[in-house]
Amino acid sequence: MSIKVAVWGPGSMGVIALRAVIDHPELQLTDLVVHSDAKAGRDAGELCGIGAVGVAATKDAAAMLDGDAEVVVYAAAANLRPLEAVADMVSILRAGKNVVSCSVVPLVYPNAVDSAFTDPLRDAALAGGVSFFTTGIDSGFANDVLPLALSGVSRNIDSIRMTEMFNYGTYPDRAAVYEILGFGQPPEFAAFAATPGVFTFGWGPVLHQIATGLGTRIDDIAETVERIPAEESFDTPTGHIAAGTIAAMRSTLTGYVDGTPTFVLDHVSR
């Protein structure tokens, strides 16, 4: 018996999940919820680059909630709307449908997230008799689960440093690259990703998760953000980066244990 699955938000990440649901022999795609008029009405298969599968995208989330999907993959963009995304997922849970999501990154480790985000989800999951799971690669595997697994073959650990290096030159979400990250913008541009506290909100729970897994506790987290302008102009597949505009950024979180820098997480984006 196939598990009936709906996908909400076939964006840069959701379209990958959509294709995986379609291809999996034990999953049946029942619904596809979208936000844009450009995607509404189009076949789910078309949106992920394959033949038609007979499921048309819709902007009517309520219809999906009233349908027979057992699980909803929630992948709608949430960087600028985390509480709205939580409200969406609460509605899914209260409708008696399980949620698997990659949208609100810190919820990978909910124990380190403000209760304004976690309490509504817990209450809704209990009310609906269903489950809620947030996962991903970063976070969800590479910078949290993998370091903890590798720690099992270590005798002594003084510190752990996780570094993600990512080339955004071909990233399909232009808003994320040029507005949220602020690439191609002048140094004085107030990029969301460079706003103090944003990186700590998104990835601070990673440090707490690793610390807890190793039986210790973080006292404080320090955040630093460095932004580097381009020395010369160049083009990428998604746009032009003029000389003097931002072309790279390093965001660093340092978790202190008893005053000692013990856990460090770097994101090097360019």
Task: Give the positions of each predicted feature.
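Conserved active-site and cofactor/substrate-binding residues in soluble primary-metabolism enzymes
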Residues: W8, S12, I16, G67, ...
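Hydrophobic beta-strand scaffold residues
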Residues: L29, V99, S131-F132
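Short, ordered loop/turn segments at secondary-structure junctions
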Residues: H35, A78, K97, S103-L107, ...
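Active-site-lining helix/loop region of Rossmann-like oxidoreductase modules
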Residues: W8, S151-R270
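N-terminal glycine-/serine-/threonine-rich beta1-alpha1-beta2 phosphate-ribose binding loop
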Residues: M1-A95, G215
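Alpha-helical support elements that line or immediately flank enzyme active sites
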Residues: G140-G152
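Rossmann-fold NAD(P)-binding glycine/threonine-rich loop
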Residues: V86-A87, A95, S103-V130
